Every structure is written in structure tokens, then in C-alpha cells.
């Protein structure tokens, strides 16, 4: 199983590469690519960690050597948020980066599963889909927007509030991956109940958690380490499913049946072909139903922005 990380010299990319080097199954290959000249050195640094994962680093304009034979491609390349910016401010720079890298994936490893981490995910996934479609290689079961950070944050905040072990809480999060489009389904967490105020406060905290980190880092970056952990969790789940493990479920932002929007984050059963089944979002509380209806315009606009970027 070969995993490629594009944007591997960045804050998320390095954290992700470290976690994959230590946690990928024995015999896996890990390929690191970034435009930054330091990237082969990051691979040498990680190669000294004693795990049976082969690692190589590539830099420069051409990602092809890193992508050859990849089964999973995780894309974290792009600029990070600074205080006062929201994820959509990143669009102008990151849209072009994602378009370019996905064009290279389409040429070199068109059958790979692709996880998009680069923000704004609501839009960059639509860009990736349109690029793959133009190249004639789009498979909607193999393109994912990685929203796992919203899930791990939800798990952490709920566990803190309710005095639970973080490992025993799993909150499904649906919708998109920014602001009001992030909708944690707190009504579906087994064995935990919340007051209306707690639901409102937690939902808001989960939606704004990225900004909390950006502000706390005071201009020094955005959420890189927790995002690295979230991306590793998703990537490792995908690898296990591709290798035939049954019953692997993760939430991610994918093209579905269009019931809510063309792309929508929901629980997915993963398997040898990527998405095996898009699971139902289940029964929502009145609060969740209203939040879902209220976000769809924003989500659809985000998606249209990405489609237009490729097709203009």
C-alpha cells in the first residue's frame, strides 16, 4: 500500500507524515512531496524512525515521481489561515494549488483514493472533482474532503463537558467543513444527554474551533497538529478498508445523491473501492434539522465557487 502526502513540508504535512511513518501497516510505502526544497530532508529525518514503512521525499514543481503507484493521496498543500481570515480567504491561493496537484494525480495515479485537506474544503473538493471529470477519471467513491478534525474536536469537547474518556465518545458530524456548515449530531451520541443551551454552545464551539486555534497562535499559524492527527486517522482508516478490513466507518465530505447538496459530509462505510456505502444521517433533533436547512445555501455557494473556478 503506497500513500503519498502532497504538501508534506508544511505544518500539517510534517505532522501527518510522522504519524503515518509510525502507524502505517508494515510493508507500506510513504511518499512525501512538496514544492519546498527541504522535503527530501524531511523524508531522511523520518527514515531514521524504526518502523517497517519505506519513505521517500521529492521536491520541485513536478509531483509525478511521488505519485507513481500511489493507492492513497492526501493533499495538504496550500497557505494557512492568519488571524482575521476565514477559510474562504484562502480560496484565491489554494484553489490554484489544488487544481494543479489534482491534474498531476489524474495523469499519474488516476485510480488512487484522494483525501483533500487543503482549505476551504467545501470548495477545494468541488475543484478536484471537476479537474478529475475533465480528465475523464472521476470516481465519486474515491474523492474525499477530510473533515475528521470536526469529529475529533467534537469528541474531545463532549468528553470534557460530560466527564467521559475521549476515546469512548464518537460524534457524527455532517454538512461541510467551515463555520455554519459544520453540524455535529449531538442528539446521536449514545448515553449522553445535553440541555438546549449545551447543544447551542457546543455546536458553536465546534464550528469556531479553528478560529480559536488561529487566535491562540497569534499569527504563528493555524491548526496543524490536531489536523495532522485527524488526517492520519482518516488515511489509516482508508488504508485498512482498502486492504479488506470490514466495517470501517468514517465521516467525510463526498459527492452523494445530491439530497442536500452535491457534496455533503456524512458517515461512510469504506471498503476496497473507497466509499462502499453512504450511510443515512439518521433522525435529527429540531435544532439539528433547522441548522441543516440553514446551512445549505452557504454550502451550495461554496461548491459552485469551486465548479466555476475550473469551468470558467
Swiss-Prot record:
Reported EC number(s) for this entry are 1.1.1.37
Subunit description: Homodimer.
Instruction: Quote the record's binding site residues for NAD(+).
Output: 7-13, 34, 94, 117-119, 227
> Is Transmembrane found in the keyword set?
no
Q: Which GO terms describe its biological process?
A: malate metabolic process; tricarboxylic acid cycle
| Reaction it catalyzes | (S)-malate + NAD(+) = oxaloacetate + NADH + H(+)
In terms of SUPFAM superfamilies, this protein maps to: LDH C-terminal domain-like (SSF56327), NAD(P)-binding Rossmann-fold domains (SSF51735)
> Which EC class is the enzyme in?
oxidoreductase
Question: Which family does this protein fall into?
Answer: Belongs to the LDH/MDH superfamily. MDH type 1 family.
Q: Which PROSITE patterns match?
A: MDH (PS00068)
Which NCBIfam families does the UniProt entry name for this protein?
MDH_euk_gproteo
Q: Which Gene3D superfamilies match?
A: Lactate dehydrogenase/glycoside hydrolase, family 4, C-terminal (3.90.110.10), NAD(P)-binding Rossmann-like Domain (3.40.50.720)
Catalytic residues at 177
Q: Which residues are recorded as binding substrate?
A: 81, 87, 119, 153
Q: What does this protein do?
A: Catalyzes the reversible oxidation of malate to oxaloacetate.
Q: Which UniProt keywords apply?
A: NAD, Oxidoreductase, Tricarboxylic acid cycle
**Source species of the chain:** Escherichia coli (strain 55989 / EAEC)
Q: What Gene Ontology molecular function terms does this protein carry?
A: L-malate dehydrogenase (NAD+) activity
Q: Which GO terms describe its cellular component?
A: cytoplasm
Recorded protein name is Malate dehydrogenase
Amino acid at each position: 500500500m503506497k500513500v503519498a502526502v502532497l504538501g508534506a513540508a508544511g505544518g500539517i504535512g510534517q505532522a501527518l507524515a510522522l504519524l503515518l511513518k509510525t502507524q502505517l501497516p508494515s510493508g507500506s510505502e510513504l511518499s512525501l512531496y512538496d514544492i519546498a526544497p527541504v522535503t527530501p530532508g524531511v523524508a531522511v529525518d523520518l527514515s531514521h524512525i524504526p518502523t517497517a514503512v519505506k519513505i521517500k521525499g521529492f521536491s520541485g514543481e513536478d509531483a509525478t515521481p511521488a505519485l507513481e503507484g500511489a493507492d492513497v493521496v492526501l493533499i495538504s498543500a496550500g497557505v494557512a489561515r492568519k488571524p482575521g481570515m476565514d477559510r474562504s480567504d484562502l480560496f484565491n491561493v489554494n484553489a490554484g494549488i489544488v487544481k494543479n496537484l489534482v491534474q498531476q494525480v489524474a495523469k499519474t495515479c488516476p485510480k488512487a483514493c484522494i483525501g483533500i485537506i487543503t482549505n476551504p474544503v467545501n470548495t477545494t473538493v468541488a475543484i478536484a472533482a471537476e479537474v478529475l471529470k475533465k480528465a475523464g477519471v472521476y470516481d465519486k467513491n474515491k474523492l474525499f474532503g477530510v473533515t475528521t478534525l470536526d469529529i475529533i474536536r467534537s469528541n474531545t469537547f463532549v468528553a470534557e463537558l460530560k466527564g467521559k474518556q475521549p476515546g469512548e465518545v464518537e460524534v457524527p458530524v455532517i454538512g461541510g467543513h467551515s463555520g455554519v456548515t459544520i453540524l455535529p449530531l449531538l442528539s446521536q451520541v449514545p448515553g449522553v444527554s445535553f440541555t438546549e443551551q449545551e447543544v447551542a454552545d457546543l455546536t458553536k464551539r465546534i464550528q469556531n474551533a479553528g478560529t480559536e486555534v488561529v487566535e491562540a497562535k497569534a499569527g504563528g499559524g493555524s491548526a496543524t497538529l490536531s489536523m495532522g492527527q485527524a488526517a492520519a486517522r482518516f488515511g489509516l482508516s482508508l488504508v485498512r478498508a482498502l486492504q479488506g478490513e470490514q466495517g470501517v466507518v468514517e465521516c467525510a465530505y463526498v459527492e452523494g445523491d445530491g439530497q442536500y447538496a452535491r457534496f455533503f459530509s456524512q458517515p461512510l462505510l469504506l471498503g476496497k473501492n473507497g466509499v462502499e456505502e453512504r450511510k443515512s444521517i439518521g433522525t435529527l433533533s429540531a435544532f439539528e434539522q433547522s441548522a441543516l436547512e440553514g446551512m445549505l445555501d452557504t454550502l451550495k455557494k461554496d461548491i459552485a465557487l469551486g465548479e466555476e473556478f475550473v469551468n470558467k
